[in-house]
């Protein structure tokens, strides 16, 4: 009899294991109930902001945007432009200037949109890298800033061939030889993102993640593109921004007839997971259990008798496709994100998942694969 099947049958008939499984199922069921109750509560809490979104946008256009500070930069307009949304309340990071140098090296003209005022000396330094700097209140989060940047280009009659829209929630590029911009330019799709999130059971919720977009000429030259950005609500509840803007943007433009693609998809993560060398698999599995909350049953074959030793890592392909682990891109273990997928980005978020990821980067020897400027920031990020 197949050894893996034998172990499954043994554990199935083991009373101690049966009790443990029942307890685990009860805990998982209870956890799901609490998550669902919390989800409903969060939605109710966000309703006033949802209803105010359009009114806030109208008010902002009439009087609020008058408080924005506009500074002319020293760089010219380019055929391809980038809008870079930043929010750096503790002062501008050196990695921001690394990113700006990279964008300039790729021939992009840059519009900086800051969701807070910047110091005068920072503004002067930024102007050396940008065509335009817009300082605004943090109204509407990233999409509010994206909107101001796009409308500013239109007001100045700047019509780029391609428009890159991104924010500073990620370190980018993490390597000097990054080819993300080149790959986006080579794509025949009208809109390109880094990762296509399709973990939802509902296709309408499948979307490109909003920290990076490239809108091609067919999109930016279409009057519906500008109309879309003119009319978007301005939410001050981040959950509304995610649910009603980030998630819906992809489907809205697909319904307009534009083609969508991403540089990475869940299938790439699954393939990378399966190709991890046996000698490197243990810390990866431990990470998904301790940092991302997966139970050992997700990786049943490798955690025989609850032990991370002596399991059958060769049988992992049986277990992994049935889990949701391959929907994790930004918070993937660095063995997958950095080494296997050669990701151009790392998330800055201070959620415990990303704290654990940065710890794994530092302790797992992945720092050497990251630019020195970002290395320094990453090491000190959680202190």
Swiss-Prot record:
UniProt keywords (A-Z) are: Plasmid
Q: Which domain of life is it from?
A: Bacteria
Q: Which family does it belong to?
A: To V.anguillarum virulence protein VirA.
What is the stated purpose of this protein? Could have an enzymatic function.
Q: What is this protein called?
A: Uncharacterized protein y4gN
Report the source organism.
Answer: Sinorhizobium fredii (strain NBRC 101917 / NGR234)
